[in-house]
């Protein structure tokens, strides 16, 4: 009996020892594997990145950018793309920003900083297009990259770029202003690659592409006459004529792609006001007065996060009371509209495609809901909450 128990106990202890040995070996191998994975991740993170920007130039970064300077944060810059790619971490990545978001999109700025208070702590570095860009300050911030809208390339290369090149700060050009699908796609890709967020950038690009092509594919099949359209930025109020557009820039390019015939296409190079008589002579089918929040201009068209529907209706109505406008087709036929001026030249301007197409061809786009698309974009990509009034048809 004693011998049997002894043999049993011996086997039991041998099994326990073997089990412990196997567990130890497994832990060691796992630890080694983890260390190897960690080294692999670190090596990947520190691996040089080659980016092709919208100009076709190749830019090499030593690693994914962790310190970034941006321009034209109000529209057409990298700010919203970075926010969509990196979420709340965007305030840690941007080390220098221009003042246009707070200056020209006050409603958006107020709303964004309420959701993300760290935005206010990002150093202001001026704007290239306003000749206030502080090159020395930017160099002292030691950014890994600066994203520059293509539209300011000439001035940037004349006034700023040589000094940044000398300091070893790479420049990546992006372009949302031309409203070309390929340029939007390449800009998203370039920013995503620079930040090491290629997978997220692919999602963003796909969302944008799907919504835009759904509109343009349908527009290409419409054979009816194009409505004539006058678009003006209502920043100055009814008393002064604001910016209108050519057919290759911002609202003008968008309207053209969406099947509108821009009446200012041959009289403006990119953007600028026209003579009041010109609009009366052209007598457009549709008038669009674009709004935002310009608090220093109380009669300006107001839309966005801080807009009141009834008050904005009255502001829009005031534009139709300009001299001679009561005789215009668009006014008589109740074809006067507004949309937020912060929507074009951006990663979410696919909603502008939807809104313009539905405005110009309501029957063909009856199933499209641009406001629902904008809300979906905010909820899916941006670290900011959705709200406000972004589109309006004059009652």
Language-model features, listed with the residues they occupy:
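Bacterial N-terminal signal peptides that target proteins for export
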Residues: 3-19
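Hydrophobic alpha-helical transmembrane signal-anchor segments
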Residues: 22-24
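N-terminal ligand-binding lobe of clamshell/alpha-beta domains
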Residues: 33-395
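C-terminal motif of bacterial Sec signal peptides marking the signal peptidase cleavage site
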Residues: 28-31
């Amino acid at each position: 009996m004693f011998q049997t128990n002894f043999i049993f106990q011996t086997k039991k202890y041998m099994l326990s020892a073997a089990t412990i040995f196997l567990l130890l070996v497994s832990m060691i191998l796992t630890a080694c594997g983890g260390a190897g994975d960690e080294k692999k991740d670190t090596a990947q993170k520190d691996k040089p990145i080659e980016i092709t920007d919208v100009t076709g130039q190749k830019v090499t970064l030593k690693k994914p950018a962790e310190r970034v300077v941006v321009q034209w944060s109000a529209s057409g810059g990298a700010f919203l793309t970075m926010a969509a790619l990196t979420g709340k971490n965007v305030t840690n990545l941007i080390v220098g920003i221009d003042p246009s978001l707070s200056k020209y999109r006050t409603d958006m700025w107020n709303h964004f900083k309420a959701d993300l208070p760290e935005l206010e702590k990002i150093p202001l570095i001026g704007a290239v297009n306003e000749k206030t860009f502080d090159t020395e300050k930017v160099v002292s911030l030691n950014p890994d990259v600066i994203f520059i809208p293509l539209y300011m390339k000439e001035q940037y290369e004349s006034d700023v770029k040589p000094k940044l090149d000398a300091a070893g700060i790479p420049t990546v050009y992006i372009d949302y202003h031309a409203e070309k699908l390929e340029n939007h796609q390449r800009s998203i890709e370039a920013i995503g690659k620079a930040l090491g967020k290629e997978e997220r950038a692919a999602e963003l690009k796909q969302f944008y592409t799907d919504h835009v092509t759904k509109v343009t594919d349908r527009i290409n099949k419409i054979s009816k006459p194009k409505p004539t359209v006058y678009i003006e930025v209502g920043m100055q109020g009814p008393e002064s004529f604001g910016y209108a557009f050519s057919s290759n820039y911002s609202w003008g390019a968008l309207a053209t792609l969406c099947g509108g015939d821009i009446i200012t296409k041959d009289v403006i190079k990119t953007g600028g006001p026209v003579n009041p008589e010109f609009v009366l002579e052209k007598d457009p089918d549709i008038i669009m007065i674009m709004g935002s929040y310009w608090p220093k201009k109380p009669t300006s068209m107001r839309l966005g996060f801080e807009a009141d529907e009834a008050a904005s209706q009255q502001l829009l109505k005031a534009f139709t009371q300009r001299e001679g406008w009561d005789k215009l087709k668009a006014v008589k036929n109740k074809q006067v509209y507004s949309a937020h001026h912060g929507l074009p030249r951006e990663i979410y301007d696919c909603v502008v495609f939807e809104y313009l197409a539905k405005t110009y061809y309501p029957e063909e786009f009856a199933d499209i809901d641009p406001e629902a698309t904008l809300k979906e974009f905010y909820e899916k990509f941006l670290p900011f909450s959705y709200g406000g009034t972004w589109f309006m048809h004059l009652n």
